[in-house]
């Protein structure tokens, strides 16, 4: 006679079967509907309130939630004038020893459509090829809400122990979460004391195992404007007399970045890499090898800055980087005349290591760029209003280490969990670490090879998402049954 599991312990096979079935019948259809809504984040759609797309996305997700057959589930949509809407839900625990709450976090706003979609695909029409679901906002981060609730429901369906759970799903993450402090102040009494934060809005090194994200970079930026003339001038007449605004701009950016290597110069943009993270990065590099750079759509003979996977992972997670993401004052090639242009303006985006103070770094960047302008030209750096600090995960408690390993082995054919630092930014994570200093953090996600979030052909790897959902369910069960601290 087989040994009976202790009371409240989830049966792994039943969890996997339930989650897989729910993905086919409930989750995937909801994510398809979400993709069809052009719920562009307010930073890219100043008229978002008039357009109503964010409200549509939030209302659709809330309507789905209200039909989920979970005992005691309560759903509310919070709104206030001028603020993005937010979904808050509560699910009572059952058979749990955990006194603290599990907090699920995610977002329903999206990056803009962008250019370059191929194969007849578009941002706002879902296409499923049997493995990947293409469309904007499916992987980043529309799947997270139904996946989180499905993980809880898998435990309820078999009477397994589950902790009290609350969910906060916002509509402004891609704009730096400007309204989240307000909503958390409103919700604090209802959230309660948090023992575990779950965020599914991050990445994975591959699709062969569960990946725990151990750090995120911060973000800041601004607009750099260089002006040399009031009006454009004949390039034959002015060239060699009037300095090129583009050349001046290059010199200014060289103050920040080594043009030969891409390394950033100011010390304020750097931090020490903890030895534990170096060791984990080496382990991830050994697992991934050439996949670290093979995940990108290289053109021609272009190659990565190095072929050392460990250095690339450290660059992405623990070192700063600079990108020019937009430009004004430069006409399209087809209409470019022989004119020495009066000005060049670019949008500068910086990603910063996890423990760097983003506001202080941005202030120093502005000082460096505006000091002693070449040729006395007009140089103005306008910093972005919203900055976001990075995040470094707290030390894992023994129960979480064991739960992660067991869940990965159960749901990924025996493969153990792996750990990785990610280069993206989730503004809320650092705030939650400060607000709940004793909480553990489960940051993971589906943004692995080929996901291409923010770019063309964004896609959700559905088989991985199903396994991630099952893994989350088993971890929640372990959290509910973990021994209370002495």
Where are these regions (language model features)?
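N-terminal helical capping/dimerization or prosegment-like subdomains
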Residues: 2-116, 343, 347
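An extended, acidic, His-containing surface patch that forms the Zn2+-binding/catalytic region
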Residues: 58, 97, 206-207, 265-343, ...
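Fold-level recognition of mixed alpha/beta catalytic cores in primary-metabolism enzymes, strongest
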Residues: 138-303, 313-320, 435, 457-465
